[in-house]
Amino acid sequence: MTMQTMTAASGHDAEAGTPPDGPLLALDGITVTFPGVRALDAVSLSVRAGEVHGLMGENGAGKSTLLKVLSGVNQPQAGTLTLNGTAQRFASTRAALEAGIAIIYQELHLVPELTVAENLMLGQLPSRLGVVDERTLAARALDALERLGEHIDPGIPVKYLSIGQRQMIEIGKALMRHARVIAFDEPTSSLSARETTQLFRIIRALRAEGRAIIYVTHRMEEVYELCDRVTVFRDGRRIDTFDSVADLDRDRLIGCMVGRSIEDVYGYRSRPAGDVLIEAKGLAGPGLAEPVSFTARRGEIVGFFGLVGAGRSELMKLLYGAVRPSAGHVELNGKRVAFGSPRDAVRAGIALCPEDRKQEGIVAIASVADNLNISARRHFSPARVLLDGRRERELAQKYIERLAIKTRDGDTPIGALSGGNQQKVVLARWLAERIDVFLMDEPTRGIDVGARAEIYNLFYELAEAGRTVILVSSDLAEVIGVSDRIVVMKEGRIAGEVAKAHATPDALIKLALPR
């Protein structure tokens, strides 16, 4: 569906979103305080009709609190909120929705057991004589799905949909309520590349209709691709608003978010490399088009860069024993090793921090201490019969302090932590195992810039201690800023290697692009 047909289908919705002169949404001097914390400090922000306005900042910068003010969850102690020229004060989320503001949160607010149609019309189900009018319900749901370009059966329960499809249902709910302002909170964090492309298409269509879009993200590439303007928050304050994203220097944007220069974020520290620690010789397997060979030395951070489908994650799984190679082998400290499982790799000194941290790296409902001790327990209780609770608590506390993991204590569910602190717990798990080779697959994805700097510092400490870090990253600035040298993969094979002195975005992209 094109933007034109989507706009035409929306009819009066687009008209309803047309403001008088000035911004569609304006916040002036908004202040929100909690016991001992000023979450928002006299924040002012304006969002125009027909624009995508990005919000960036580290965790705790105030972005989520701002969304909660817009949605009526949090009541400001000072300041005014104006919508379409009229001052508003929302006592509830329902009041905000009725006024025309919808929030698409990271954790989607759908009822899994209800159908697509029922979720789309939740709270406003059409009825006759107190009975749901199924025909009208289905017709309205189909209309909403058509406007989104989604071919989904409105009669199936939402629990059978993908994350991307569920997100489209959330957007459909906002359209059904004629929302003029739609805010997205980290919307691509769980989406595939195809689903992200679909989401961006919809957001551009909503912008073309004259709606005001607020887009909260940690991902700078998304800001440059999608946003017209961007506002940066730090420590509850609005630091700056940039009116032309296309002309915005990336280093300046990072500096605004963290209050320091990009050099300080990556903080690269050179060090001498030692002997070869790990070597792949003719390694072949699923996702690799030809045998792969490379070496990594003690004290090195070796970056692996490539586009989606280049085979980097598949190579990491072969090194980690998660997938058995069809040919070739791995050598560790000059000795040939073969792993029947990841457990064998860990015992040999190789660990993987997987790309999908939430699904493969942590047990979200378990505590920080339990997640940290998953592998170390075999040292406490070789027979695996009894758990040593005291030693586990002591180990957890040791690494909470050593890695500055922001958590109340080791009993806190890891799912309650930020992405950066979850990643620190995964790293701590392997530090407790005396690992020599750290395979880091997209380790900072979805993590704010400040937490990234802390993780990079951990990498440098590991390398300085004679360990090897293999960093798989799709972030050009990251892989150039942190790595000692960079291996570029393309279409399941190694396309080349670039020394740090010659590592530029153009050099890496030229090697990574398909033939």
Curated annotation (Swiss-Prot):
EC top class, as a word: translocase
Segments forming domain ABC transporter: 25-260, 260-511
Highest taxon listed in the record's lineage: Bacteria
GO MF term set: ABC-type L-arabinose transporter activity; ATP binding; ATP hydrolysis activity
Main location: membrane
Presence of the UniProt keyword Disulfide bond in the record: no
Pfam families registered for this protein in UniProt: ABC_tran (PF00005)
UniProt xrefs under InterPro entries: AAA+_ATPase (IPR003593), ABC_carbohydrate_import_ATPase (IPR050107), ABC_transporter-like_ATP-bd (IPR003439), ABC_transporter-like_CS (IPR017871), P-loop_NTPase (IPR027417)
SUPFAM superfamilies linked: P-loop containing nucleoside triphosphate hydrolases
Protein name as catalogued: Arabinose import ATP-binding protein AraG 2
Organism: Burkholderia cenocepacia (strain HI2424)
